[in-house]
Structure formats: structure tokens, C-alpha cells
From Swiss-Prot:
Pfam families: DAHP_synth_1. It is found in: Cytoplasm. Belongs to the KdsA family. It comes from Paraburkholderia phymatum (strain DSM 17167 / CIP 108236 / LMG 21445 / STM815) (Burkholderia phymatum). Keywords: Cytoplasm, Lipopolysaccharide biosynthesis, Transferase. It catalyses: D-arabinose 5-phosphate + phosphoenolpyruvate + H2O = 3-deoxy-alpha-D-manno-2-octulosonate-8-phosphate + phosphate. It comes from the Bacteria. One of its GO terms (biological process) is keto-3-deoxy-D-manno-octulosonic acid biosynthetic process. This is 2-dehydro-3-deoxyphosphooctonate aldolase. GO terms for cellular component: cytoplasm. It is an enzyme of class 2 (transferase). Its EC number is 2.5.1.55. PANTHER family: PHOSPHO-2-DEHYDRO-3-DEOXYHEPTONATE ALDOLASE. Pathway: Carbohydrate biosynthesis; 3-deoxy-D-manno-octulosonate biosynthesis; 3-deoxy-D-manno-octulosonate from D-ribulose 5-phosphate: step 2/3; Bacterial outer membrane biogenesis; lipopolysaccharide biosynthesis.
Length: 284
């Protein structure tokens, strides 16, 4: 599958989707994107910058949602213009898709909306690549139905069916907790879609702080290493210059100054894993 100006897949190095959870300001967004670009260029990691113009799914109605669509998209367009980066952001309703698709390179669907058929169809008809997040309530094999919906809509619109990624972000485990079953990455590969692992939302504690979500960022490196060891096409991680002051999802964000070391470790592991065939292909 081609994403921007690079190819993705199990026979390629993993690509990275990374950035702040939400657009907080223009300067911080440009600075963060610039630092990530520098890191990824040094490590030769294909990179897509991500940030949200609006966080529609909030624990509390008083939580910070973002700067709004117009200002958020303007800032994301500046990331593209000033830094020459590909940009991803999430859409939350059908009416947002057209204006957002006119600015960004990749759309993302929120996990809670993965079974909304009309919404998935509309995203597929945008013509953009789409990172489809698996719901926290969904079994990994059920992602086949979601990917099939997107492919069917694309085919009916006369568009390429080879534009959809399946993203794992953990599964609900009791109240206010998520776990990551690494088998799900292999199971979702059977859809034929490139599989992405969201290493930061997977350590989220949804609603764990009452009016906001908590998180356990100390487990991000653990889960990221495990996911890369299974063989994945892409990795998703949110980061922030100062997670303690982040306006959204700070507890599970990777400190920006730790990204280089973490990514270097993951690249070494990815190269080792992909040097040899995947043994599970011969185990049935």
C-alpha cells in the first residue's frame, strides 16, 4: 500500500504516526512536528504527523476539545507548508469529511465509530487513505467486517480499495482499564490491510481520573516493543513537550525528549523481526 510518498507493509520498515493528541497552539505544533521530522529523518523512519483539531470524545463536557476545525486545520496546513510533512487527523462526523480531506493527507476514524456504517462509507468515499481504529469493544476478527465496508464503498465509488489500515488501540478490561492482546495484530493482518499499533492509547485508563482519562505511559515502551516484535506495518504514538501540562491525554503521552531513544530501539527490533519469514504462516 502506498501512503504519501512511501510504501508500507510487512516487507517494509515500520512507518510512524506521531504528534500531540490535540492542536494546542500553532507554535507548539510546528515545534513538535519539526523535532519529530528531525528524529525520523535521522533514523530513516517514514513519518506522518498527527494531531486533532477537535476531541469530540471527552470524559467531561468541561474538558479541552481543541481550537476548532477552522483554526486547527489552518495550523495543520502550516505543518505541511512549512515542514513538508504528510498530516493525519481524525474526523468525527460525515459533514466534517470533505473540508478535512481537502487539507490533510490521511483520515482517521475514532475507535468508538468503527461500526457506524454510513460514517465508514463516507470516509472511504473521500479518496484519502484511512486509518480505521478498532473499537475497544471489538474482537480483532470483527475488523474484517469494518475493512470490508470501507472497501465496498470505495469500489462502488470507483476508487482504490487499497487505502485502509486497521489500528489496534487496546480492548476494555473491566472498568477504566485497557489491555493489549498481541494476538490481535496477527489476526487483523488476515484482513489484508496494513496493521498499525497505537502504543499510547493502549495504556490509557479511560475515565480513570473522574473527569478525565488517566494513563500509564511507563508501559508504552513495553507494548511498543511487543507489537513491533509481532511484525506490524505502522506504529502510532502521541507525544508532548511537557505531558504534565498537556491539555488532552497527557498521562499516556511519550515525553518528546524520549522519542528518539525509543524509536531507535524499535527500529533495531523491527529490522531483526523482518529479516526472516513470519513463522506463524507455516504453523497451520
Amino acid at each position: 500500500m502506498k501512503l504519501g510518498d512511501f510504501e508500507i507493509g510487512l516487507d517494509k520498515p515500520f512507518f510512524l504516526i506521531a504528534g500531540t493528541c490535540v492542536v494546542e497552539s500553532e507554535q507548539m505544533t510546528i515545534d513538535t512536528a519539526g523535532k519529530l521530522k528531525e528524529i525520523c529523518a535521522k533514523l530513516k523512519i517514514p513519518f506522518i504527523y498527527k494531531s486533532s483539531y477537535d476531541k469530540a470524545n471527552r470524559s467531561s463536557g468541561k474538558s479541552f476539545r481543541g481550537l476548532g476545525m477552522d483554526e486547527g486545520l489552518r495550523i495543520l496546513s502550516e505543518v505541511k507548508r512549512q515542514l513538508g510533512l504528510h498530516v493525519l487527523t481524525d474526523v468525527h462526523s460525515e459533514h466534517e469529511i470533505e473540508p478535512v480531506a481537502s487539507v490533510v493527507d490521511v483520515l482517521q476514524t475514532p475507535a468508538f465509530l468503527c461500526r457506524q456504517t454510513d460514517f465508514i462509507h463516507a470516509c472511504a468515499r473521500s479518496g484519502k487513505p484511512v486509518n480505521i481504529k478498532k473499537g475497544q469493544f471489538l474482537a480483532p476478527h470483527d475488523m474484517k467486517n469494518v475493512i470490508d465496508k470501507a472497501r465496498d464503498a470505495a469500489r462502488e465509488a470507483g476508487l482504490s480499495e487499497d487505502r485502509f489500515m486497521a489500528c489496534e488501540r487496546g480492548v476494555s478490561f473491566g472498568y477504566n482499564n485497557l489491555v493489549s492482546d498481541m494476538r490481535s495484530l496477527a489476526i487483523m493482518r488476515e484482513t489484508g490491510a496494513p496493521v498499525v499499533f497505537d502504543a499510547t492509547h493502549s495504556v490509557q485508563l479511560p475515565g480513570g481520573q473522574g473527569t478525565s482519562s488517566g494513563g500509564q505511559r511507563e508501559f508504552v515502551p513495553v507494548l511498543a516493543r511487543a507489537a513491533v516484535a509481532t511484525g506490524i506495518a505502522g506504529l502510532f504514538m502521541e507525544t508532548h513537550p511537557n505531558p504534565a501540562e498537556a491539555k488532552s491525554d497527557g498521562p499516556n503521552a511519550v515525553p518528546l525528549h524520549r522519542m528518539a531513544d525509543l524509536l531507535e530501539t524499535l527500529m533495531t527490533l523491527d529490522q531483526a523481526v523482518k529479516r526472516t519469514p513470519f513463522l506463524e504462516n507455516d504453523f497451520n
